[in-house]
Amino acid sequence: MDPYGSRPSHPDDGALHGILVAFIAVLCLIGCLWAAYRLFLKECLTDCSQHTSSGVVAGPRPAATGPTAVVVHNGAEAQRSSAF
């Protein structure tokens, strides 16, 4: 005998459970997409629109033009930038 009792099952219980699980999954997906938009895409879109509206296109960074220091390692001399 079942100590917790049992209820008669309805034939639509499985379908209702599936619909409920699908609805919750869709809500979670919408929440994840909204969070991704707020965190990443919004910032990327504003950066891209600022670059295209000002006519500035991101290119390679110029090389550092700082003074160099002589580095001696195991008797070999090399020039190394102070930026590193």
UniProtKB/Swiss-Prot annotation:
Localization, UniProt: Host membrane
Keywords: Host membrane, Membrane, Transmembrane, Transmembrane helix, Transport, Viral movement protein
Main localisation: host cell
Name of the featured protein: Putative movement protein
Residues passing through the membrane, by range: 15-35
Bilayer topology term: Single-pass membrane protein
Keyword NAD: no
Function as written in the Swiss-Prot or TrEMBL entry: Involved in the viral transport within, and between cells.
GO aspect biological process, one term: transport of virus in host, cell to cell
Subunit structure as annotated in this protein's UniProt entry: Interacts with the capsid protein (CP). Part of a MP-CP-viral DNA complex.
Species the sequence originates in: Miscanthus streak virus (isolate 91)
Any GO CC annotation of this UniProt entry: host cell membrane
